[in-house]
């Protein structure tokens, strides 16, 4: 018997951290919710990280996901910006981990490949495929859309692992 798994995808960022929640049952995907947690750019770094933590903790507590997926960050030329993004990503991993969830990580190219079929694509392609895969999906902005794509990537990857385990067992 299959059970419904609720997944939260998180697209970390210091200004805006996107989140998207889906449910998966077998091959089917269902949109649950999406949004963005923001931090006040006028505040110090520690306070901004607290804002992200508290906002994500509220989402995790409210929607009770079973698993989490976070996008891996890329290193850019601005070392300070990369470090700050890494700290926001730490919050994005800490919140679900503290709630007892398994946290998976996916490279941006893996997320795009899972949703649009290729590792390099435009935001508009991702938005379009989200609507194809989940017609009831609602998202405001790229961060929430990216978070939904991360959740879908995890759903596809966990399904592949489950299928391989079933084949080995049977």
Swiss-Prot record:
- Zinc-finger keyword on record: no
Name a biological process GO annotation. Answer: DNA repair
Q: Domain of life, per the record?
A: Bacteria
- Give the principal location in a single coarse category: cytoplasm
* Catalytic activity of the protein: Endonucleolytic cleavage at a junction such as a reciprocal single-stranded crossover between two homologous DNA duplexes (Holliday junction)
Q: What class of enzyme is it?
A: hydrolase
Q: Which cofactor does it need?
A: Mg(2+)
Q: What is this protein called?
A: Crossover junction endodeoxyribonuclease RuvC
